[in-house]
């Protein structure tokens, strides 16, 4: 019998990641459990749940969400910690956005984007077709038994989710992201480094150009 799934929170949607993990971990067990309940108890609810677990499309959505939310949860947890380095948090947010963009847009275009352009970058102009996006090995493996038309629709919906996620992250990036990253040159660790001390010339130039 499958274990109880974590209760979903209406306000903390990121907490749903734990529920998604548990659902995937016991997917086959849950499918078998509700199939047996359908046959032995003639339970309508059990039948509905069995059909949901038997549908490969639902499994694909869960696999996509699990992989997509994993990195987001890590960064979100860092933001909630006490005494976190604000510059490090900003770098984590930038890297998170870049990781999602790497899924959506061609690599050659991603390499051309400067950090200070990330907030205003219109990714919808460069997003690849869902059929050309790689959603990961587990997703690809699970998609084998899904027909082409349905798979195309699933990929497009996953792509739309990622686009909106990127847009929301963009809204949370600071406008002076380039200067903030250069300020990290002045951290105690960098300032007292015996080798490879950072060149602060670019930082000084940034303040001069912003006068």
Regions inferred by a protein language model and the residue ranges of each:
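Alpha-helical structural modules in large enzymes and assemblies
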Residues: 1-211
């Amino acid at each position: 019998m499958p274990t109880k799934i974590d209760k979903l929170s209406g306000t903390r949607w990121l907490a749903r990641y734990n529920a998604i993990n548990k659902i995937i971990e016991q997917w086959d067990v849950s499918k078998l459990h509700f199939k047996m309940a359908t046959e032995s108890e003639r339970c309508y609810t059990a039948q509905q749940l069995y059909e949901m677990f038997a549908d490969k499309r639902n499994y694909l959505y869960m696999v996509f969400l699990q992989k997509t939310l994993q990195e987001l949860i890590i960064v979100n947890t860092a933001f909630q910690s006490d005494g976190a380095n604000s510059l490090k948090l900003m770098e984590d947010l930038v890297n998170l956005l870049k990781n999602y963009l790497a899924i959506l847009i061609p690599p050659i275009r991603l390499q051309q984007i400067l950090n200070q352009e990330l907030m205003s970058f219109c990714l919808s102009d460069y997003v690849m077709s869902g059929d050309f996006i790689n959603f990961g090995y587990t997703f690809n493996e699970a998609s084998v038994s899904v027909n082409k038309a349905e798979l195309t629709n699933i990929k497009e919906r996953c792509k739309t989710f990622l686009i909106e996620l990127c847009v929301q992250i963009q809204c949370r990036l600071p406008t002076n992201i380039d200067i903030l990253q250069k300020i990290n040159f002045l951290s105690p660790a960098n300032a007292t480094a015996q080798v490879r001390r950072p060149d602060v010339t670019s930082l000084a130039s940034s303040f001069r150009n912003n006068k």
